[in-house]
Amino acid sequence: MESVSDSTAEVSATMDCDGNTEAFEKVKSKKREKCKRAAAEMDTQTEESSSSAPVKRPHFPALSGDQLGGGVDEMRKVPVPSHRYTPLKENWLKIFTPIVENLQLQVRFNLKTRQVEIKTCKETQDIGALTRAADFVKAFVLGFQVEDALALIRLDELFLETFDVTDVKPLKGDHLSRAIGRIAGKGGKTKFTIENVTKTRIVLADTKIHILGSFQNIKMARTAICNLILGSPPSKVYGNLRAVATRSAERF
């Protein structure tokens, strides 16, 4: 009898266990559900983007010089020394023609203030034209030929550099005159040689030296002139210039 009761208890226990297993529900992890939702959203977005037409970039028309300046006309004034009045008067047609026709600027010579005044107008297209025109007039006032100064309008990589002989070495009297004579050379030979090798233009105005050219070429010409001021013989300077010229030719 005891064995029969034990077997019935075991059967009821197994029945209870089976009932309990059916009562429990499996809970899915929330992380997996989130990942599945995110993947489904990404798929729908890619389908929508592929089906829709490609987005066009916004097109903004270029502003004119008048609009960039805010409608206010800008002006540059270049003072003219007394010894350059006559050359300015003789070459005035060559000076104002490229400024007015090519750069679309207004220019005049103020007789009261003795200055060349350059001004923008509604026809001005390039905002940097005013600076280039001022550099062009300044180069002519310093003593450069109109044809050489015109390169400042045509080319962007040209610069003007000015320094004094006494900035290199504090010379006075005859020593200063001899230094200037060494830079010029007999009949201007040394100056022309430096100009041709370095592809620059040099103006000697009393103790002032003005160089027109690209940054690298100005550096070469300035080094040669400084060596002459410090007392190097012209033959040595010529040799150094040739070496530098051959090096630069090999690079390019």
UniProtKB/Swiss-Prot annotation:
Origin superkingdom: Eukaryota
Keywords: Nucleus, RNA-binding
UniProt keyword Secreted present: no
InterPro entries given in the database record: KH-I_PNO1_first, KH_dom, KH_dom_type_1_sf, KH_PNO1_2nd
GO MF annotation list: RNA binding
Bias-annotated ranges (Polar residues): 1-11
Main location: nucleus
Annotated Gene Ontology cellular component terms: nucleolus; nucleus; small-subunit processome
Chain intervals with Basic residues compositional bias: 28-37
Annotated segments matching region Disordered: 1-72
Annotated PANTHER family: RIBONUCLEASE Y, RNA-BINDING PROTEIN PNO1
Role of this protein: Part of the small subunit (SSU) processome, first precursor of the small eukaryotic ribosomal subunit. During the assembly of the SSU processome in the nucleolus, many ribosome biogenesis factors, an RNA chaperone and ribosomal proteins associate with the nascent pre-rRNA and work in concert to generate RNA folding, modifications, rearrangements and cleavage as well as targeted degradation of pre-ribosomal RNA by the RNA exosome. Positively regulates dimethylation of two adjacent adenosines in the loop of a conserved hairpin near the 3'-end of 18S rRNA.
Protein's name according to its UniProt entry: RNA-binding protein PNO1
Protein source organism: Danio rerio (Zebrafish)
